[in-house]
From Swiss-Prot:
GO terms for molecular function: DNA binding; DNA-binding transcription factor activity; metal ion binding. This is HTH-type transcriptional regulator ZntR homolog. Transcriptional regulator. PROSITE patterns: HTH_MERR_1, HTH_MERR_2. Residues 4-23 bind DNA. Pfam families: MerR_1. One of its GO terms (biological process) is positive regulation of DNA-templated transcription. The keyword Ribosomal protein does not apply. InterPro entries: CadR-PbrR, DNA-bd_dom_put_sf, MerR-type_HTH_dom, MerR_fam. PANTHER family: HTH-TYPE TRANSCRIPTIONAL REGULATOR ZNTR, REDOX-CYCLING DRUG-SENSING TRANSCRIPTIONAL ACTIVATOR SOXR. It comes from the Bacteria. Keywords: DNA-binding, Transcription, Transcription regulation. Gene3D superfamilies: 1.10.1660.10.
């Protein structure tokens, strides 16, 4: 399979695949007589795993560690779970922060609707911007 077909199958770019190859996340593919990269099923599966991990916001260095644990023993499975637990905590933190942001936005919207003041002034006041009177 050529790189364009692989990229299309994965829903990523050719540049992304080349980058992952440069970073050592996938083995270099064989080359055709015309010097084109020729990818196989192993590349497809490995890149699919990498893309799924990236969608979960797992860093490339962590993905590399996970790929090195391919034939996971019990100890290695614990390492995989450690990485996943870290990301679960990070996602929970982000969810909490986003929920807080959502509430602040709702409050601000309600104030702009129910207040006779200039909506832009209200927005700036709630953004933490300090007003200074110029003489």
């Amino acid at each position: 399979m050529k790189i364009g077909a692989l990229a299309k199958a994965l829903g990523c770019t050719v540049e992304t695949i080349r980058y992952y190859e440069q970073q050592g996340l996938i083995p270099p593919p064989k080359r055709t007589s015309g010097n084109f990269r020729q990818y196989n099923e192993e590349h497809l599966q490995r890149l699919s795993f990498i893309c799924n991990c990236r969608n979960l916001d797992i860093s490339l260095s962590e993905i590399k560690s996970l790929l090195n644990l391919e034939n996971a023993s019990k100890q290695q499975a614990e390492e995989i779970n450690r990485v996943l637990d870290k990301h679960i905590k990070e996602v929970a933190t982000r969810i909490h922060e986003l929920a807080h942001l959502r509430m602040k936005l709702i409050e601000l919207r309600e104030k702009t609707v129910s207040n006779d003041e200039d909506p832009m002034k209200l927005l700036l006041q709630h953004s933490g911007v300090k007003f200074v009177r110029l003489k």
